[in-house]
Curated annotation (Swiss-Prot):
Organism: Verminephrobacter eiseniae (strain EF01-2)
Role this protein plays: Binds 23S rRNA and is also seen to make contacts with the A and possibly P site tRNAs.
Composition skew (Basic residues), residue ranges: 1-13
Disordered: annotated segments: 1-20
Protein name: Large ribosomal subunit protein uL16
Length: 138
């Protein structure tokens, strides 16, 4: 699963996920992409599950790019622990997603195969997504 190799600080504040994606909003590497139209978080497990779904469907064909990286630690306190006594330990990592962000890209497969692979991947993700293709001549 994806997670940072090293971090300067183990824990991070919650923050707010606002605005729309300006970087990473166009298909840059492949021919087809899976674009999120919702705002939210993708965990490393969700990204990996979607990647496996795409890989299994396209079999040996095509090249896949993961355009997001889960670099934000989410901390939780253990069950039945009283409030206070500091912040909990980091449990997992998430990628903050703004509307318009491309999550996956693929090249080397027909459009119908890419659509079906991304449909299977979208079922693993908690956000609404749409299929996009590269603009010809751009």
């Amino acid at each position: 699963m994806l997670q940072p190799a090293r971090r300067k600080y183990r824990k991070e504040q919650k923050g707010r996920n606002t605005g729309v994606a300006t970087r990473g909003a166009t298909v840059a590497f492949g021919d087809f992409g899976l674009k999120c139209t919702d705002r939210g978080r993708l965990t490393a497990r969700q990204i990996e599950a979607a990647r496996r779904a795409i890989s299994r469907h396209v079999k040996r064909g095509g090249r896949i790019w993961i355009r997001v990286f889960p670099d934000k630690p989410i901390s939780t306190k253990p069950a039945e622990v009283r409030m206070g006594n500091g912040k909990g330990n980091p449990e997992y990592y998430v990628a903050e997603i703004q509307p318009g962000k491309i999550v996956f890209e693929i090249v080397g497969v027909p459009e119908e195969l890419a659509r079906e692979a991304f449909r299977l991947a979208a079922a693993k993700l908690p956000l609404r997504t749409t299929f996009v293709s590269r603009l010809i001549g751009a």
